[in-house]
Amino acid sequence: MKSMDPIIGASSRILRSTPRKLNLVADLVRNKKVSFATVQLRFCEKKAAGLIGKVLNSAIANAQYNYGLDIDNLYIKEILIGKSFTLHRVCPKAMGRANRVSKHYSNITIKLRQIV
């Protein structure tokens, strides 16, 4: 039998950060209350914290305006960090040589659920 409480989500694609760096920050707030997670992300000094914080704020806004839910009763059910595409660039070196530089991109999906 399905539960009646909704699962609210928000996602962001094509973020200029590697999935590994995003996962380090996502592990801090996975399965935590939304109020605790926003404070953790606000005081975390990593760039990935700002990217995850924006997606989390979007999910909170979806919960408030689309479902009329209270923020205090929400927790982060799951955070999915996925690999997107990789751009390859060339960095010139000495004596006519060149190295490749990989610029990695990621996708984030956050799903919230109401505490029952």
UniProtKB/Swiss-Prot annotation:
Subunit structure comment from the entry: Part of the 50S ribosomal subunit.
Originating organism: Wolbachia sp. subsp. Brugia malayi (strain TRS)
Biological process (GO), any one: translation
Function statement: This protein binds specifically to 23S rRNA; its binding is stimulated by other ribosomal proteins, e.g. L4, L17, and L20. It is important during the early stages of 50S assembly. It makes multiple contacts with different domains of the 23S rRNA in the assembled 50S subunit and ribosome. The globular domain of the protein is located near the polypeptide exit tunnel on the outside of the subunit, while an extended beta-hairpin is found that lines the wall of the exit tunnel in the center of the 70S ribosome.
InterPro entries registered for this protein in UniProt: Ribosomal_uL22 (IPR001063), Ribosomal_uL22_bac/chlpt-type (IPR005727), Ribosomal_uL22_bac/org-type (IPR047867), Ribosomal_uL22_sf (IPR036394)
Gene name as annotated: rplV
Keywords: Ribonucleoprotein, Ribosomal protein, RNA-binding, rRNA-binding
UniProt cross-references to Gene3D superfamilies, sorted A to Z: Ribosomal protein L22/L17 (3.90.470.10)
PANTHER family given in the database record: CHLOROPLAST 50S RIBOSOMAL PROTEIN L22-RELATED, LARGE RIBOSOMAL SUBUNIT PROTEIN UL22M
The protein's name in its UniProt record: Large ribosomal subunit protein uL22
Family stated for the protein in its record: Belongs to the universal ribosomal protein uL22 family.
GO terms, molecular function: rRNA binding; structural constituent of ribosome
Coiled coil: none
Cellular component GO terms, alphabetical: cytosolic large ribosomal subunit
